[in-house]
């Protein structure tokens, strides 16, 4: 999706996993490009989408699980038997212009905006519709909107609808209708800001910054009924429920004043002045009540990016699923956010209070639920993911 000043790739499996587009380690940072009019402005390293439930019967293996979790990312992906792509279609209000020189495309950007269908009545300049069947009897419909308007070109709106359809494979040859108890939606965001100064490009920032080792993550609005001093509010008084991340201090930076990623060995311009993040626009209160529940998300704990649960996921391992569901997906809110704990210290030296280590940096998680879904029930969650920061003229002062 590459209109406006924020570009990102989207996967047919429903989530953008680590090196999931090209498979190349040099593309550790790939996506969420802002400002996208300039090269190597990627801020995204990996994402994860986990769906969980409790007291769940799985007809595929004829087994009752205390907890069942299916995964797409941040590393694991099974598109045959877990998160199964059904559709990925790009709609455009208009197609992109075609620019040729002597019969050849003038730029590789020609291939980054492939519109499948043109609809001049779209509310956005681009829309991606993505449908995924999961192996827990839930279908996900994901719709992503992007805009080219100067005041709306730095965010994408992402709408998720989860439907208890009872299907466990692509063709619904395995079908079992049941009430789904404690349905939880859990997303992980691993940001690395930004690619310009990292090892595979400008190479003036510490190597591990390329996988987000020094990324700082903060959360606001987690207690709407008891706001804190740093919470923010919309013009109508509603609290903003969001997470945001930036390039923090790194112990190997030389000199150590590396906020903004200055190119000290070159012209001194800032190569990591972006802030990126996600805000919750809407989360259904229940399948029967579509009003916006301001107490969602119910989980805002951070997770270290190399935590054992971020790889080797197994949907039929009940012990692992229980650990994921209880210790990560539904764990609630920490007393302090990751950024509050790190403070003015080096973010790459932060140790997770739960695991005692942190070799790969820290990701931010948000969890929605729990919901109880009867057969045919659905719930809807709407997020906005965006990026902003200093303008090009300011980072070169």
Functional labels for PLM-detected ranges:
Residues 1-394:
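A long-range scaffold signal marking pre-active-site subdomains of enzyme folds
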């Amino acid at each position: 999706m590459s209109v406006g000043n924020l570009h990102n790739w989207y996967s047919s499996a429903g989530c953008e996993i680590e090196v999931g587009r090209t498979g190349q380690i040099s593309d550790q940072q790939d996506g969420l490009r802002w400002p996208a009019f300039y090269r190597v402005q990627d801020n995204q390293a990996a994402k994860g989408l986990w769906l969980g439930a409790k007291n769940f019967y799985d007809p595929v293996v004829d087994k009752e699980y205390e907890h069942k979790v299916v995964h797409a990312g941040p590393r694991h992906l099974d598109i045959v038997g877990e998160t199964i792509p059904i559709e990925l279609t790009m709609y455009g209000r208009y197609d992109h212009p075609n620019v040729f020189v002597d019969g050849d495309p003038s730029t590789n950007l020609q291939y980054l905006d492939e519109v499948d269908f043109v609809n001049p009545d779209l509310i956005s300049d681009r829309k991606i519709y993505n449908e995924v069947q999961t192996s827990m009897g839930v279908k996900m419909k994901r719709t992503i909107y992007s805009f080219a308007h100067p005041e709306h070109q730095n965010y994408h709106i992402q709408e998720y609808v989860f439907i208890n359809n009872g299907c466990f494979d692509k063709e619904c040859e395995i079908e079992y209708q049941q009430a789904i108890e404690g349905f939880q939606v859990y997303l992980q965001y691993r940001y690395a800001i930004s690619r310009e100064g990292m090892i595979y490009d400008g190479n003036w920032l510490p190597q591990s910054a390329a996988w987000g080792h020094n990324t700082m993550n903060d959360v606001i609005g987690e207690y709407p009924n008891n706001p804190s001093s740093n919470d923010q509010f919309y013009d109508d008084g509603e609290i903003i429920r969001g997470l945001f991340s930036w390039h923090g201090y790194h112990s190997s930076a030389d000199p150590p004043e590396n906020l903004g990623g200055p190119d000290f060995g070159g012209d001194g311009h800032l190569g990591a002045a972006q802030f990126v993040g996600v805000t919750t626009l809407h989360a259904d209160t229940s399948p029967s009540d579509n009003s916006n529940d301001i107490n969602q998300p119910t989980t805002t704990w951070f997770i270290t990016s190399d935590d054992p649960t971020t790889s080797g996921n197994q949907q039929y391992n009940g012990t692992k699923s229980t650990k994921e569901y209880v210790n990560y997906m539904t764990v609630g809110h920490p007393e302090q956010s990751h950024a509050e704990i790190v403070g003015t210290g080096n973010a790459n030296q932060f140790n997770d209070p739960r695991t005692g280590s942190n070799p790969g940096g820290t990701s931010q998680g948000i969890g929605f639920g729990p919901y109880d879904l009867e057969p045919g029930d659905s719930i809807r969650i709407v997020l906005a993911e965006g990026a902003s920061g200093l303008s090009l003229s300011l980072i070169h002062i």
